[in-house]
């Protein structure tokens, strides 16, 4: 039986689960771990098939969420970045009693562009899937570079993301393809109308993967949720703007 890698950090009286994005692992939170650890008990996890949670194949969103839920705290704020935002959202849908609040970071309920909905063109996601089998390492690096484009610290931020990937075992191509398939096909826009826990959505103004145009659309679709756009951030605001990012979480915590 394979186990998912978890680590608990910090001694705060509020539990916070942090879920990373596609191709990465829990080391991505290293730059904010100290700051958040004095206010929260952090639960860091490598998603199934990523980092130290090896031995898993490609999964659907539902399967991935079920695996993560097995060893998760009874109640916590669930924060998911990018692909991790879909896992956190699915957790809020399937186990609402365990989700004190939901936070999505540079994430979308529907990453793929649809009619009347801004997103990544499906053919671009399909292209990434094709390139993975051709040149695995280069495709992952290209995807990481896209995440920091436009920020004042873009090169440095991209190096940070690359070091996170290289710090742990690389996911299998099958797992990465499965993650891209989730990004290409999942649409939780309607389902998330029904969540009623506090729900904060954080975006980067310069994000090239999750367009800021979705923020007002979701403000209308999900009036119970709150959105915040970080002015000079791209797809990884916790790396480029750690202080503002942590402050947004402290504000949420104080409102619970």
UniProtKB/Swiss-Prot annotation:
Listed Pfam families: Abhydrolase_1 (PF00561)
Keywords noted in UniProt: Biotin biosynthesis, Cytoplasm, Hydrolase, Serine esterase
What does the record give as the reaction this protein catalyses?
6-carboxyhexanoyl-[ACP] methyl ester + H2O = 6-carboxyhexanoyl-[ACP] + methanol + H(+)
Molecular functions (GO terms): pimelyl-[acyl-carrier protein] methyl ester esterase activity
Catalytic residues of the enzyme: 82 (nucleophile), 207, 235
Q: Where does the record say this protein resides?
A: Cytoplasm
Q: Which GO terms describe its biological process?
A: biotin biosynthetic process
Top-level taxon in the UniProt lineage: Bacteria
Catalytic class of the enzyme: hydrolase
InterPro entries with a match to the protein in the record: AB_hydrolase_1 (IPR000073), AB_hydrolase_fold (IPR029058), BioH (IPR010076), Carboxylesterase_BioH (IPR050228)
**What's the Enzyme Commission number for this chain?**
3.1.1.85
Q: Which GO terms describe its cellular component?
A: cytoplasm
Its UniProt pathway annotation is: Cofactor biosynthesis; biotin biosynthesis
Pinpoint the AB hydrolase-1 domain residues. 15-242
Q: Which residues are noted in the entry as substrate-binding?
A: 22, 82-83, 143-147, 235
- SUPFAM superfamilies assigned: alpha/beta-Hydrolases
Could you tell me what this protein does? Answer: The physiological role of BioH is to remove the methyl group introduced by BioC when the pimeloyl moiety is complete. It allows to synthesize pimeloyl-ACP via the fatty acid synthetic pathway through the hydrolysis of the ester bonds of pimeloyl-ACP esters.
Quaternary structure and interacting proteins, as annotated: Monomer.
Q: What does the similarity note say?
A: Belongs to the AB hydrolase superfamily. Carboxylesterase BioH family.
Q: What is this protein called?
A: Pimeloyl-[acyl-carrier protein] methyl ester esterase
Question: What organism does the UniProt record list as the source?
Answer: Salmonella paratyphi A (strain AKU_12601)
Q: Which gene encodes it?
A: bioH
